[in-house]
């Protein structure tokens, strides 16, 4: 017998064998060459499927390679300045930048850095 996916083929002639769970008795018989296989051979079969990355092409997956998903520390820079009170020192000015860290249907994450004391925090919009 030869197993391809969840299909079971006869080793002698290559014909598709019946589903062992649907066959009465203790054996599975090939309808073409009459080869006999004990049903016990099929009891612990594990079906594992895999696909190549390019098996299901999509325009969304093609765009994924264009979107940068990680940043280095020095790439964040200072960001824009906003009038926002620092919860640590009370300074009225902070730098901020946003990143889309969660799924696209959720808001961006805003990172704040105090221009005075350097305190950092983030909020999820």
Curated annotation (Swiss-Prot):
Stretch list, region Interaction with RPA2: 1-60
Gene3D superfamilies membership: 2.20.25.10
GO MF terms held by the record: DNA-directed RNA polymerase activity; nucleic acid binding; RNA polymerase II-specific DNA-binding transcription factor binding; zinc ion binding
PROSITE patterns hit by this protein: RNA_POL_M_15KD (PS01030), ZF_TFIIS_1 (PS00466), ZF_TFIIS_2 (PS51133)
GO biological process: negative regulation of transcription by RNA polymerase II; nucleolar large rRNA transcription by RNA polymerase I; ribosome biogenesis; termination of RNA polymerase I transcription; transcription by RNA polymerase I; transcription elongation by RNA polymerase I; transcription initiation at RNA polymerase I promoter
Subcellular location: Nucleus, Nucleolus
Assigned GO CC terms: nucleus; RNA polymerase I complex
InterPro entries from the UniProt entry: DNA-dir_RNA_pol-M_15_CS, Rpa12/Rpb9/Rpc10/TFS, Zn_ribbon_RPA12_C, Zn_ribbon_RPB9, Znf_TFIIS
Main subcellular localisation: nucleus
Residues bound to Zn(2+) 1: 10, 13, 30, 33
Chain spans, region Necessary and sufficient for recruitment into Pol I: 1-69
Keywords: DNA-directed RNA polymerase, Metal-binding, Nucleus, Ribosome biogenesis, Transcription, Zinc, Zinc-finger
Function in brief: DNA-dependent RNA polymerases catalyze the transcription of DNA into RNA using the four ribonucleoside triphosphates as substrates. Component of RNA polymerase I (Pol I) which synthesizes ribosomal RNA precursors. Besides, RNA polymerase I has intrinsic RNA cleavage activity. Proposed to contribute to the polymerase catalytic activity and form the polymerase active center together with the two largest subunits. Subunit RPA12 contributes a catalytic zinc ribbon that is required for RNA cleavage by Pol I. Involved in transcriptional termination.
Complex formation: Component of the RNA polymerase I (Pol I) complex consisting of 14 subunits: RPA135, RPA190, RPC40, RPA14, RPB5, RPO26, RPA43, RPB8, RPA12, RPB10, RPC19, RPC10, RPA49 and RPA34. The complex is composed of a horseshoe-shaped core containing ten subunits (RPA135, RPA190, RPB5, RPO26, RPB8, RPB10, RPC10, RPA12, RPC19 and RPC40) where RPA135 and RPA190 form the DNA-binding cleft. Outside of the core, RPA14 and RPA43 form the stalk that mediates interactions with transcription initiation factors and newly synthesized RNA. Interacts with RPA2/RPA135.
PANTHER family the record matches: DNA-DIRECTED RNA POLYMERASE, DNA-DIRECTED RNA POLYMERASE I SUBUNIT RPA12
Record-given protein name: DNA-directed RNA polymerase I subunit RPA12
Gene: RPA12
